Swiss-Prot record:
Fluorescent proteins have become a useful and ubiquitous tool for making chimeric proteins, where they function as a fluorescent protein tag. Typically they tolerate N- and C-terminal fusion to a broad variety of proteins. They have been expressed in most known cell types and are used as a noninvasive fluorescent marker in living cells and organisms. They enable a wide range of applications where they have functioned as a cell lineage tracer, reporter of gene expression, or as a measure of protein-protein interactions. There is a cross-link at residues 63-65 (2-iminomethyl-5-imidazolinone (Met-Gly)). The keyword tRNA processing does not apply. Pigment protein. The keyword Zinc does not apply. This is Red fluorescent protein eqFP611.
Amino acid sequence: MNSLIKENMRMMVVMEGSVNGYQFKCTGEGDGNPYMGTQTMRIKVVEGGPLPFAFDILATSFMYGSKTFIKHTKGIPDFFKQSFPEGFTWERVTRYEDGGVFTVMQDTSLEDGCLVYHAKVTGVNFPSNGAVMQKKTKGWEPNTEMLYPADGGLRGYSQMALNVDGGGYLSCSFETTYRSKKTVENFKMPGFHFVDHRLERLEESDKEMFVVQHEHAVAKFCDLPSKLGRL
């Protein structure tokens, strides 16, 4: 247990960027229990609102990127909590099946006992008649991220699905590289493992100008038994 990371932690976030050339900025604040893997965040669009695209494509960069709030089961070293007080960064490319591409660069730091996130995002090639630009998405299904050590950090891959108005899904693939600001020689790296995520929107108002979302995340090994004794 990292003494700098308490059982209840506050967080603050500033996100800015563009989607199909449209500029915007969001801020958020929240709290949660990093050791139980639960967190709640309240997010406001402070520039460029109401957004002309679905807020859902931003949602995963607020909380699916809030990696300090993951419960790690026994035997899995916590790469993210070990990174403090220096913190960590991550870069992600999300490719949607309709051709849209969403890239994120995020920095996580610890300031006066509060986790502070700065995110730069860029979305391109989202079809004007697609679910994202028509704002016809209805939230993310739960998913599992696959993680393993790579290039001195962690590499994450996952397939995700957005619910769409009228039934059906818009699927996408995530590829994320996580890097600690601390040299990896100073802590224990995890091996191959998975993280289950459930990201839910609890509240929204004013045409998605204000959103409250909650996430529960747990790191684990494969649940299936191995004949070779592997985890």
